[in-house]
Amino acid sequence: MAWSLELRRRNCGKDANLQSEEIDEQHESVDLLIVFTKSMQLENMLNSLKPIISKDTYVLCLLNGLGHEDVLERFVTRDHIIMGVTMWASMMTAPGHITFANDNGNVEIQCLDPKGKDETQKIVKILTDAGLNASYSENVMYSIWRKACVNGVVN
C-alpha cells in the first residue's frame, strides 16, 4: 500500500507533498533510509524494509531515545549507521499531514564509524540545502543523551 505525506512549514509558505511507493521484492535498494519511527517499532520496520536495504544503504537514525544503534547493526554495517538528533519539532495535524512547530530547528548527525564521514557530510549538505540547518557532529552521542535527559524530565 502506498502513502502520501504532506509537510508544512509555518510562516514560510513552504509545503512539500511526498508520495511513497509500495515496497516489494522487485524494488531496487535505496542509498539512504531515514528512520523516525518509535523505538519499539524500529526492528519490525527494518525487517519490513529488508527488500530495499543493501550493503550500500546508509541508515540515518533520528529517533528519540538511546540504544538504537544496537538494532541498526543487525541490518547494516557500523560504517553505514548515521546517528542523529533533531530539534525540529513537528505535529501530526491529520493522518499523513505533518506541520513543523518551530522555524529554527536543527539536525546534528555523525556516522558511527569514521569510514562513513565523507558520505555523512554529503547528507549534511543535502539536509542543509533542504532548509533543515544540518551539521556534522564529532560527538553526536552527547547531544542524543542531552535530549534524552530533557525528554525524560519533560515527558
What are the residue ranges of the model-derived segments?
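Glycine-rich phosphate-binding loop and adjoining beta1-alpha1-beta2 segment
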Residues: 1-13
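Short, charged/polar "capping" segments at the starts of alpha-helices
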Residues: 1-2, 69-70, 117
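Flavin (primarily FAD) cofactor-binding/catalytic cores of flavoenzymes
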Residues: 1, 47-49, 119
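Internal alpha-helical scaffold of NAD(P)-dependent oxidoreductase catalytic cores
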Residues: 51-52, 74-80, 95-154
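Short linear interaction motif-like sites in intrinsically disordered regions of transcription factors
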Residues: 2-4, 89, 146
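Rossmann-like NAD(P)(H) cofactor-binding subdomain of soluble oxidoreductases
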Residues: 10-97
